[in-house]
């Protein structure tokens, strides 16, 4: 990861990320509840390993390793594989590549903590 770059969770790696540390489930929540991606603001090195120690989320909320409890955010170099660089859509065409009548595109990240909310969202969206 690099300072100034934007990242999002790799949907295929969320469970792996949560399994690494009990605090990682809170960090998944932070990312999802604050716009789905973050920009790296600070990286520290300790014993030859890099750590992301401060981020700014898509909605402007800032989290760092000084936070307590649910506000704590720190990523170790060994966890970077669970993320991918975030690419902002440059136009509506990029955001909705396949325009098909009657199709709604929803981008969501699902884990065991929010599965019921996502199911309800899908029901509300498609059963009108």
UniProtKB/Swiss-Prot annotation:
InterPro entries found in the cross-reference section: FRD2
UniProt-listed Pfam families: FRD2
Stated name of the protein: Uncharacterized 14.8 kDa protein in frd-Gp32 intergenic region
